[in-house]
């Protein structure tokens, strides 16, 4: 889903019902790939896709591993994005968390992946060492306080929501502008679901490019 959880919320608003990116990912591999035939993935792989987020702990080890790996990835990439956006510096991260988890983007990811592998191998249970898991949870809380609720980050989220919602309304009004291979799907799934599938499959850059192409007059420079 473009723009991550901001995009997820934007699609939920226009659809009038919850949109979950993990359920959409499962829909892609089960129903949309290979012209509707799906990829015929194993149960364990499908549960890894479906269970990487949400309140329920996945019942398979594959799902449990993906769930922790997803959190490792998004927290550290969000830190990297926040640093590049000037919202945060590496030194702003509490010292005791850096002492446990590492002092750099690469260092944290390497440490957490190794800790996940070693702890799971030693205990037979998928997870991080308790002190490391506690530090990860505290780092996540720190990110909510300093980054996710930051006015600069929220303003970018508002822009992302506006882009996706305008794209949605445009394609609902102009279904003939959808890529040709999406059009037959409307006969089976309806226009709303088809437009949602198309937008949900966009990257951030592609969504921005589509918005610029459809709504920004040619020759105007947007800064």
Report the location of each language-model feature.
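Histidine-centered, transition-metal-coordinating active-site segments
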Residues: 19, 23-223
